[in-house]
Amino acid sequence: MKSLTCFKAYDIRGKLGEELNEDIAWRIGRAYGEFLKPKTIVLGGDVRLTSEALKLALAKGLQDAGVDVLDIGMSGTEEIYFATFHLGVDGGIEVTASHNPMDYNGMKLVREGARPISGDTGLRDVQRLAEANDFPPVDETKRGRYQQINLRDAYVDHLFGYINVKNLTPLKLVINSGNGAAGPVVDAIEARFKALGAPVELIKVHNTPDGNFPNGIPNPLLPECRDDTRNAVIKHGADMGIAFDGDFDRCFLFDEKGQFIEGYYIVGLLAEAFLEKNPGAKIIHDPRLSWNTVDVVTAAGGTPVMSKTGHAFIKERMRKEDAIYGGEMSAHHYFRDFAYCDSGMIPWLLVAELVCLKGKTLGEMVRDRMAAFPASGEINSKLAQPVEAINRVEQHFSREALAVDRTDGISMTFADWRFNLRSSNTEPVVRLNVESRGDVKLMEKKTKALLKLLSE
Protein backbone atom coordinates (compact mmCIF):
# COMPACT_ATOMS: atom_id res chain seq x y z
CA MET A 1 0.00 0.00 0.00
CA LYS A 2 1.58 3.24 -1.18
CA SER A 3 1.26 6.23 1.13
CA LEU A 4 -0.37 9.36 -0.31
CA THR A 5 1.90 12.29 0.53
CA CYS A 6 -0.66 14.85 -0.70
CA PHE A 7 -2.54 14.54 2.62
CA LYS A 8 -1.33 17.38 4.87
CA ALA A 9 -2.33 18.50 8.39
CA TYR A 10 -5.40 20.51 7.33
CA ASP A 11 -6.01 19.79 3.65
CA ILE A 12 -4.75 18.01 0.54
CA ARG A 13 -1.89 19.51 -1.49
CA GLY A 14 0.56 17.87 -3.82
CA LYS A 15 2.73 18.03 -6.89
CA LEU A 16 0.82 17.13 -10.02
CA GLY A 17 1.51 13.75 -11.58
CA GLU A 18 2.98 11.65 -8.80
CA GLU A 19 1.46 13.17 -5.63
CA LEU A 20 -1.90 14.17 -7.10
CA ASN A 21 -3.55 12.99 -10.32
CA GLU A 22 -6.98 11.94 -11.60
CA ASP A 23 -6.66 8.39 -10.22
CA ILE A 24 -5.81 9.72 -6.75
CA ALA A 25 -8.66 12.25 -7.03
CA TRP A 26 -11.07 9.40 -7.84
CA ARG A 27 -9.78 7.46 -4.81
CA ILE A 28 -10.22 10.53 -2.56
CA GLY A 29 -13.82 10.90 -3.79
CA ARG A 30 -14.51 7.24 -3.21
CA ALA A 31 -12.90 7.37 0.26
CA TYR A 32 -14.83 10.52 1.26
CA GLY A 33 -18.05 8.78 0.20
CA GLU A 34 -17.29 5.52 2.02
CA PHE A 35 -16.16 7.23 5.25
CA LEU A 36 -18.77 9.98 5.64
CA LYS A 37 -21.56 8.26 3.72
CA PRO A 38 -23.06 11.60 2.61
CA LYS A 39 -26.19 11.75 0.48
CA THR A 40 -25.30 14.93 -1.43
CA ILE A 41 -22.16 17.06 -1.59
CA VAL A 42 -21.11 20.18 -3.52
CA LEU A 43 -17.94 20.44 -5.61
CA GLY A 44 -16.08 23.44 -6.99
CA GLY A 45 -12.66 24.25 -8.38
CA ASP A 46 -10.32 27.20 -8.80
CA VAL A 47 -8.79 28.47 -12.05
CA ARG A 48 -5.82 26.10 -12.18
CA LEU A 49 -5.47 24.27 -15.47
CA THR A 50 -5.90 20.85 -13.80
CA SER A 51 -8.75 21.77 -11.42
CA GLU A 52 -11.59 20.82 -13.78
CA ALA A 53 -10.18 17.36 -14.60
CA LEU A 54 -9.39 16.62 -10.94
CA LYS A 55 -12.86 17.81 -9.91
CA LEU A 56 -14.57 15.52 -12.45
CA ALA A 57 -12.45 12.54 -11.31
CA LEU A 58 -13.39 13.37 -7.71
CA ALA A 59 -17.06 13.55 -8.76
CA LYS A 60 -16.83 10.12 -10.39
CA GLY A 61 -15.34 8.65 -7.20
CA LEU A 62 -18.13 10.17 -5.13
CA GLN A 63 -20.81 8.95 -7.56
CA ASP A 64 -19.29 5.46 -7.50
CA ALA A 65 -19.73 5.58 -3.72
CA GLY A 66 -23.43 6.42 -4.18
CA VAL A 67 -23.15 10.16 -3.53
CA ASP A 68 -25.11 12.80 -5.48
CA VAL A 69 -22.81 15.59 -6.68
CA LEU A 70 -23.76 19.24 -7.21
CA ASP A 71 -21.04 21.04 -9.20
CA ILE A 72 -20.99 24.83 -8.71
CA GLY A 73 -18.29 25.29 -11.36
CA MET A 74 -15.30 27.60 -11.09
CA SER A 75 -15.37 29.04 -7.59
CA GLY A 76 -13.46 30.24 -4.57
CA THR A 77 -13.20 28.10 -1.45
CA GLU A 78 -15.75 30.21 0.41
CA GLU A 79 -18.35 29.57 -2.30
CA ILE A 80 -18.11 25.88 -1.36
CA TYR A 81 -18.56 26.82 2.31
CA PHE A 82 -21.57 28.93 1.34
CA ALA A 83 -23.10 26.24 -0.90
CA THR A 84 -22.71 23.62 1.84
CA PHE A 85 -24.53 25.58 4.54
CA HIS A 86 -26.97 27.40 2.23
CA LEU A 87 -28.22 24.20 0.57
CA GLY A 88 -28.02 22.17 3.79
CA VAL A 89 -26.10 19.37 2.06
CA ASP A 90 -23.77 16.86 3.71
CA GLY A 91 -20.42 18.34 2.71
CA GLY A 92 -18.30 19.99 0.08
CA ILE A 93 -14.90 19.84 -1.62
CA GLU A 94 -13.04 22.68 -3.33
CA VAL A 95 -10.23 21.73 -5.72
CA THR A 96 -7.59 24.42 -5.11
CA ALA A 97 -3.93 24.91 -4.36
CA SER A 98 -4.46 28.58 -3.40
CA HIS A 99 -1.05 30.28 -3.71
CA ASN A 100 1.11 27.16 -4.27
CA PRO A 101 3.32 26.93 -7.40
CA MET A 102 1.89 26.16 -10.87
CA ASP A 103 2.71 22.44 -10.76
CA TYR A 104 0.64 21.87 -7.61
CA ASN A 105 -3.02 21.36 -6.87
CA GLY A 106 -5.02 20.33 -3.84
CA MET A 107 -8.39 20.06 -2.09
CA LYS A 108 -10.16 21.54 0.92
CA LEU A 109 -12.80 19.28 2.46
CA VAL A 110 -15.79 20.10 4.66
CA ARG A 111 -18.67 18.11 6.14
CA GLU A 112 -22.22 19.29 6.95
CA GLY A 113 -22.52 22.89 8.13
CA ALA A 114 -19.23 23.64 6.30
CA ARG A 115 -17.28 22.20 9.25
CA PRO A 116 -13.66 21.51 8.26
CA ILE A 117 -12.40 17.98 7.75
CA SER A 118 -8.78 18.09 8.89
CA GLY A 119 -6.25 15.69 10.41
CA ASP A 120 -8.09 14.57 13.51
CA THR A 121 -11.63 15.22 12.25
CA GLY A 122 -11.72 12.73 9.38
CA LEU A 123 -8.89 13.58 6.98
CA ARG A 124 -6.66 10.75 8.29
CA ASP A 125 -9.60 8.33 7.86
CA VAL A 126 -10.16 9.47 4.27
CA GLN A 127 -6.41 9.10 3.66
CA ARG A 128 -6.35 5.55 5.07
CA LEU A 129 -9.21 4.46 2.79
CA ALA A 130 -7.75 6.20 -0.28
CA GLU A 131 -4.34 4.58 0.31
CA ALA A 132 -5.83 1.10 0.77
CA ASN A 133 -7.81 1.56 -2.47
CA ASP A 134 -9.89 -1.48 -1.55
CA PHE A 135 -13.45 -0.37 -2.23
CA PRO A 136 -16.56 -2.53 -2.65
CA PRO A 137 -17.72 -3.03 -6.26
CA VAL A 138 -19.76 -0.16 -7.70
CA ASP A 139 -23.50 -0.80 -7.40
CA GLU A 140 -24.86 0.76 -10.62
CA THR A 141 -28.38 0.90 -9.14
CA LYS A 142 -27.11 3.13 -6.34
CA ARG A 143 -24.70 5.25 -8.35
CA GLY A 144 -24.90 8.96 -7.46
CA ARG A 145 -26.19 11.64 -9.85
CA TYR A 146 -24.20 14.58 -11.19
CA GLN A 147 -25.72 18.03 -11.69
CA GLN A 148 -24.26 21.45 -12.47
CA ILE A 149 -25.80 24.34 -10.51
CA ASN A 150 -25.26 28.10 -10.21
CA LEU A 151 -25.42 29.71 -6.76
CA ARG A 152 -23.60 32.97 -7.55
CA ASP A 153 -26.68 35.22 -7.11
CA ALA A 154 -27.57 33.64 -3.76
CA TYR A 155 -23.95 34.00 -2.62
CA VAL A 156 -23.86 37.70 -3.60
CA ASP A 157 -27.22 38.18 -1.80
CA HIS A 158 -25.56 36.79 1.32
CA LEU A 159 -22.49 39.04 0.98
CA PHE A 160 -24.66 42.15 0.70
CA GLY A 161 -26.42 41.16 3.94
CA TYR A 162 -23.31 42.31 5.87
CA ILE A 163 -23.55 45.95 4.75
CA ASN A 164 -26.21 48.62 4.26
CA VAL A 165 -25.76 49.91 0.71
CA LYS A 166 -27.45 53.19 1.75
CA ASN A 167 -24.37 53.94 3.87
CA LEU A 168 -22.10 53.99 0.82
CA THR A 169 -20.87 57.39 -0.38
CA PRO A 170 -18.87 57.84 -3.63
CA LEU A 171 -15.98 55.38 -3.56
CA LYS A 172 -13.28 54.37 -6.02
CA LEU A 173 -11.83 50.93 -5.30
CA VAL A 174 -8.99 49.07 -7.02
CA ILE A 175 -9.58 45.31 -6.98
CA ASN A 176 -6.83 42.90 -8.06
CA SER A 177 -8.12 39.36 -8.55
CA GLY A 178 -4.67 38.11 -9.61
CA ASN A 179 -6.22 36.18 -12.55
CA GLY A 180 -7.72 33.87 -9.90
CA ALA A 181 -11.27 32.76 -9.13
CA ALA A 182 -12.28 36.15 -7.65
CA GLY A 183 -12.81 37.86 -11.04
CA PRO A 184 -16.35 36.62 -11.81
CA VAL A 185 -17.44 37.34 -8.21
CA VAL A 186 -16.06 40.89 -8.46
CA ASP A 187 -18.06 41.28 -11.71
CA ALA A 188 -21.22 40.07 -9.94
CA ILE A 189 -20.65 42.47 -7.02
CA GLU A 190 -20.05 45.34 -9.46
CA ALA A 191 -23.32 44.53 -11.26
CA ARG A 192 -25.15 44.43 -7.90
CA PHE A 193 -23.72 47.84 -6.89
CA LYS A 194 -24.99 49.26 -10.20
CA ALA A 195 -28.42 47.65 -9.84
CA LEU A 196 -28.77 49.14 -6.35
CA GLY A 197 -27.55 52.57 -7.45
CA ALA A 198 -24.52 52.48 -5.13
CA PRO A 199 -21.93 55.16 -6.03
CA VAL A 200 -19.04 52.67 -6.09
CA GLU A 201 -16.55 52.55 -8.97
CA LEU A 202 -14.43 49.39 -9.27
CA ILE A 203 -11.10 49.54 -11.09
CA LYS A 204 -10.42 45.90 -11.91
CA VAL A 205 -6.83 44.65 -12.24
CA HIS A 206 -5.94 41.16 -13.58
CA ASN A 207 -9.65 40.34 -13.39
CA THR A 208 -9.78 37.64 -16.08
CA PRO A 209 -9.40 34.11 -14.65
CA ASP A 210 -6.34 32.45 -16.18
CA GLY A 211 -4.78 29.27 -14.84
CA ASN A 212 -1.48 30.19 -16.53
CA PHE A 213 -1.21 33.10 -14.04
CA PRO A 214 0.43 35.47 -16.57
CA ASN A 215 1.02 38.04 -13.81
CA GLY A 216 2.44 35.54 -11.30
CA ILE A 217 0.85 33.32 -8.65
CA PRO A 218 -1.43 35.62 -6.62
CA ASN A 219 -0.13 35.78 -3.05
CA PRO A 220 -0.23 39.38 -1.77
CA LEU A 221 1.27 38.25 1.54
CA LEU A 222 4.59 38.45 -0.37
CA PRO A 223 5.80 42.06 -0.86
CA GLU A 224 6.80 41.31 -4.46
CA CYS A 225 3.14 40.54 -5.28
CA ARG A 226 1.83 43.96 -4.21
CA ASP A 227 3.17 46.39 -6.83
CA ASP A 228 0.32 46.13 -9.35
CA THR A 229 -2.32 46.91 -6.70
CA ARG A 230 -0.27 49.71 -5.12
CA ASN A 231 0.48 51.33 -8.49
CA ALA A 232 -3.18 51.17 -9.59
CA VAL A 233 -4.33 52.86 -6.34
CA ILE A 234 -1.85 55.70 -6.89
CA LYS A 235 -2.53 56.02 -10.64
CA HIS A 236 -6.32 56.19 -10.25
CA GLY A 237 -6.42 58.14 -6.97
CA ALA A 238 -8.47 55.33 -5.43
CA ASP A 239 -9.85 55.30 -1.88
CA MET A 240 -8.62 51.77 -1.24
CA GLY A 241 -6.97 48.76 -2.88
CA ILE A 242 -8.03 45.13 -2.48
CA ALA A 243 -6.03 42.09 -3.58
CA PHE A 244 -6.83 38.38 -3.35
CA ASP A 245 -4.99 35.09 -3.43
CA GLY A 246 -5.99 32.40 -5.95
CA ASP A 247 -9.07 31.03 -4.16
CA PHE A 248 -9.83 34.41 -2.49
CA ASP A 249 -10.21 33.07 1.03
CA ARG A 250 -7.77 35.83 2.07
CA CYS A 251 -8.19 39.52 1.29
CA PHE A 252 -5.38 42.08 1.49
CA LEU A 253 -6.01 45.80 1.81
CA PHE A 254 -4.09 48.89 0.70
CA ASP A 255 -4.83 52.43 1.89
CA GLU A 256 -5.46 55.52 -0.25
CA LYS A 257 -1.70 56.03 -0.69
CA GLY A 258 -1.17 52.47 -1.91
CA GLN A 259 0.38 51.41 1.39
CA PHE A 260 -0.17 47.75 2.33
CA ILE A 261 -2.05 47.44 5.63
CA GLU A 262 -1.02 44.44 7.72
CA GLY A 263 -3.90 42.03 8.35
CA TYR A 264 -3.32 42.44 12.10
CA TYR A 265 -4.74 45.98 12.11
CA ILE A 266 -7.72 44.99 9.93
CA VAL A 267 -8.69 42.46 12.64
CA GLY A 268 -9.00 45.31 15.16
CA LEU A 269 -10.96 47.44 12.68
CA LEU A 270 -13.51 44.69 11.94
CA ALA A 271 -13.76 43.65 15.60
CA GLU A 272 -14.68 47.22 16.55
CA ALA A 273 -17.27 47.40 13.75
CA PHE A 274 -18.95 44.18 14.89
CA LEU A 275 -18.96 45.27 18.53
CA GLU A 276 -20.70 48.54 17.66
CA LYS A 277 -23.62 46.48 16.31
CA ASN A 278 -23.29 43.59 18.82
CA PRO A 279 -22.22 44.98 22.22
CA GLY A 280 -20.49 42.51 24.54
CA ALA A 281 -19.85 39.90 21.83
CA LYS A 282 -16.85 37.57 21.82
CA ILE A 283 -14.05 38.07 19.30
CA ILE A 284 -11.53 35.31 18.48
CA HIS A 285 -7.91 36.17 17.67
CA ASP A 286 -4.65 34.27 17.19
CA PRO A 287 -1.62 34.52 19.53
CA ARG A 288 0.97 35.77 17.04
CA LEU A 289 0.11 39.46 17.42
CA SER A 290 -2.60 40.29 19.93
CA TRP A 291 -2.14 43.50 21.94
CA ASN A 292 -3.95 45.76 19.46
CA THR A 293 -6.89 43.36 19.10
CA VAL A 294 -7.24 42.86 22.87
CA ASP A 295 -7.04 46.63 23.44
CA VAL A 296 -9.66 47.45 20.77
CA VAL A 297 -12.05 44.67 21.82
CA THR A 298 -11.81 45.47 25.55
CA ALA A 299 -12.30 49.21 24.96
CA ALA A 300 -15.39 48.45 22.85
CA GLY A 301 -16.90 46.30 25.62
CA GLY A 302 -16.30 42.95 23.93
CA THR A 303 -14.53 39.81 25.14
CA PRO A 304 -11.28 38.83 23.38
CA VAL A 305 -10.66 35.07 23.20
CA MET A 306 -7.32 33.66 22.05
CA SER A 307 -7.21 30.55 19.86
CA LYS A 308 -4.42 28.50 18.35
CA THR A 309 -3.50 29.62 14.82
CA GLY A 310 -5.13 27.81 11.87
CA HIS A 311 -8.59 27.74 10.34
CA ALA A 312 -9.68 24.45 11.92
CA PHE A 313 -8.79 25.68 15.44
CA ILE A 314 -10.32 29.15 14.96
CA LYS A 315 -13.59 27.76 13.56
CA GLU A 316 -13.90 25.23 16.37
CA ARG A 317 -13.27 27.92 19.01
CA MET A 318 -15.72 30.31 17.35
CA ARG A 319 -18.45 27.67 17.52
CA LYS A 320 -17.62 26.87 21.13
CA GLU A 321 -17.73 30.56 22.17
CA ASP A 322 -20.46 31.56 19.68
CA ALA A 323 -18.15 34.41 18.68
CA ILE A 324 -19.49 36.91 16.14
CA TYR A 325 -16.13 37.43 14.41
CA GLY A 326 -12.62 36.00 14.40
CA GLY A 327 -9.49 37.28 12.73
CA GLU A 328 -5.95 36.11 12.09
CA MET A 329 -3.07 38.42 11.21
CA SER A 330 -2.57 36.30 8.05
CA ALA A 331 -5.65 37.97 6.47
CA HIS A 332 -8.10 35.19 7.33
CA HIS A 333 -11.37 36.62 8.66
CA TYR A 334 -14.17 34.43 10.08
CA PHE A 335 -17.85 35.29 10.52
CA ARG A 336 -20.54 33.65 12.66
CA ASP A 337 -23.21 34.31 10.04
CA PHE A 338 -21.00 32.66 7.41
CA ALA A 339 -21.20 29.34 9.29
CA TYR A 340 -18.12 30.44 11.29
CA CYS A 341 -16.08 30.15 8.07
CA ASP A 342 -13.52 32.49 6.57
CA SER A 343 -14.34 34.81 3.69
CA GLY A 344 -12.18 37.07 1.55
CA MET A 345 -15.15 39.03 0.17
CA ILE A 346 -16.96 40.06 3.37
CA PRO A 347 -13.99 41.99 4.89
CA TRP A 348 -13.46 44.49 2.08
CA LEU A 349 -17.19 45.20 1.82
CA LEU A 350 -17.27 45.94 5.56
CA VAL A 351 -14.16 48.16 5.39
CA ALA A 352 -15.58 50.05 2.37
CA GLU A 353 -18.75 50.71 4.39
CA LEU A 354 -16.65 51.80 7.40
CA VAL A 355 -14.71 54.32 5.27
CA CYS A 356 -18.06 55.89 4.33
CA LEU A 357 -19.62 55.73 7.82
CA LYS A 358 -16.60 57.19 9.62
CA GLY A 359 -15.80 59.78 6.96
CA LYS A 360 -12.16 58.74 7.29
CA THR A 361 -9.74 57.09 4.89
CA LEU A 362 -8.50 53.57 5.61
CA GLY A 363 -5.06 55.06 6.36
CA GLU A 364 -6.57 57.43 8.93
CA MET A 365 -8.58 54.62 10.56
CA VAL A 366 -5.54 52.41 11.19
CA ARG A 367 -2.78 55.01 11.67
CA ASP A 368 -3.26 55.45 15.43
CA ARG A 369 -3.47 51.70 15.99
CA MET A 370 -0.28 51.08 14.00
CA ALA A 371 1.49 53.73 16.10
CA ALA A 372 0.07 52.37 19.38
CA PHE A 373 1.19 48.78 18.69
CA PRO A 374 3.92 48.68 16.03
CA ALA A 375 4.57 45.14 14.80
CA SER A 376 7.36 43.38 12.93
CA GLY A 377 5.07 41.37 10.67
CA GLU A 378 5.81 37.65 10.42
CA ILE A 379 9.49 36.86 9.80
CA ASN A 380 10.37 33.32 8.68
CA SER A 381 13.79 31.80 9.42
CA LYS A 382 14.93 28.50 7.89
CA LEU A 383 16.87 26.65 10.57
CA ALA A 384 18.57 23.27 10.72
CA GLN A 385 17.52 22.77 14.37
CA PRO A 386 14.30 24.76 14.97
CA VAL A 387 13.44 23.15 18.33
CA GLU A 388 16.89 23.91 19.80
CA ALA A 389 16.69 27.49 18.51
CA ILE A 390 13.30 28.07 20.17
CA ASN A 391 14.61 26.59 23.45
CA ARG A 392 17.65 28.89 23.25
CA VAL A 393 15.40 31.94 22.92
CA GLU A 394 13.16 30.81 25.78
CA GLN A 395 16.11 30.28 28.14
CA HIS A 396 17.58 33.67 27.23
CA PHE A 397 14.40 35.61 28.06
CA SER A 398 12.85 33.40 30.77
CA ARG A 399 14.04 35.50 33.74
CA GLU A 400 12.69 38.84 32.54
CA ALA A 401 9.42 37.59 31.00
CA LEU A 402 6.30 38.69 32.88
CA ALA A 403 4.16 35.98 31.27
CA VAL A 404 4.70 32.90 29.11
CA ASP A 405 1.93 31.35 27.01
CA ARG A 406 2.07 28.13 24.98
CA THR A 407 -1.27 28.27 23.14
CA ASP A 408 0.69 28.20 19.89
CA GLY A 409 4.46 27.90 20.00
CA ILE A 410 5.72 30.22 22.72
CA SER A 411 4.59 33.76 23.50
CA MET A 412 6.61 35.81 26.00
CA THR A 413 5.32 39.10 27.38
CA PHE A 414 7.37 41.92 28.92
CA ALA A 415 6.43 45.39 30.19
CA ASP A 416 6.58 47.17 26.82
CA TRP A 417 6.95 44.41 24.22
CA ARG A 418 6.08 40.81 23.45
CA PHE A 419 6.89 38.12 20.91
CA ASN A 420 5.51 34.86 19.57
CA LEU A 421 7.75 32.17 18.13
CA ARG A 422 6.35 29.04 16.52
CA SER A 423 7.64 26.32 14.26
CA SER A 424 5.96 25.41 10.98
CA ASN A 425 3.96 22.18 10.73
CA THR A 426 5.31 21.46 7.28
CA GLU A 427 8.90 22.76 6.94
CA PRO A 428 12.05 23.47 9.04
CA VAL A 429 11.04 27.09 9.54
CA VAL A 430 10.36 29.16 12.65
CA ARG A 431 7.99 32.12 12.44
CA LEU A 432 8.62 35.19 14.58
CA ASN A 433 6.27 38.07 15.42
CA VAL A 434 7.25 40.99 17.66
CA GLU A 435 5.19 43.97 18.85
CA SER A 436 5.66 46.81 21.33
CA ARG A 437 3.64 49.46 23.11
CA GLY A 438 4.09 52.55 20.97
CA ASP A 439 7.86 52.16 20.50
CA VAL A 440 8.98 51.31 16.96
CA LYS A 441 12.68 51.42 17.86
CA LEU A 442 12.22 48.99 20.77
CA MET A 443 10.27 46.61 18.51
CA GLU A 444 13.02 46.77 15.85
CA LYS A 445 15.80 46.32 18.43
CA LYS A 446 14.15 43.26 20.01
CA THR A 447 13.39 41.78 16.57
CA LYS A 448 17.09 42.04 15.62
CA ALA A 449 18.15 40.48 18.94
CA LEU A 450 15.73 37.57 18.51
CA LEU A 451 16.81 36.89 14.93
CA LYS A 452 20.47 36.90 16.06
CA LEU A 453 19.68 34.42 18.86
CA LEU A 454 17.82 32.15 16.45
CA SER A 455 20.70 32.03 13.98
CA GLU A 456 23.46 31.26 16.52
Curated annotation (Swiss-Prot):
Enzyme class: isomerase
UniProt keyword Zinc present: no
Keywords of the record: Isomerase, Lipopolysaccharide biosynthesis, Magnesium, Metal-binding, Phosphoprotein
Record-listed E.C. numbers: 5.4.2.8
Metabolic or biological pathway, per its Swiss-Prot or TrEMBL entry: Nucleotide-sugar biosynthesis; GDP-alpha-D-mannose biosynthesis; alpha-D-mannose 1-phosphate from D-fructose 6-phosphate: step 2/2; Bacterial outer membrane biogenesis; LPS O-antigen biosynthesis
Catalytic activity: alpha-D-mannose 1-phosphate = D-mannose 6-phosphate
Annotated GO MF terms: magnesium ion binding; phosphomannomutase activity
Cofactor note: Binds 1 Mg(2+) ion per subunit.
Biological processes per GO annotation: GDP-mannose biosynthetic process; O antigen biosynthetic process
Cofactor: Mg(2+)
Catalytic residues identified in the record: 98
SUPFAM superfamilies: Phosphoglucomutase, C-terminal domain (SSF55957), Phosphoglucomutase, first 3 domains (SSF53738)
Family as reported in the entry's similarity comment: Belongs to the phosphohexose mutase family.
Protein name: Phosphomannomutase
Species per Swiss-Prot/TrEMBL record: Escherichia coli O157:H7
Gene this chain is encoded by: manB
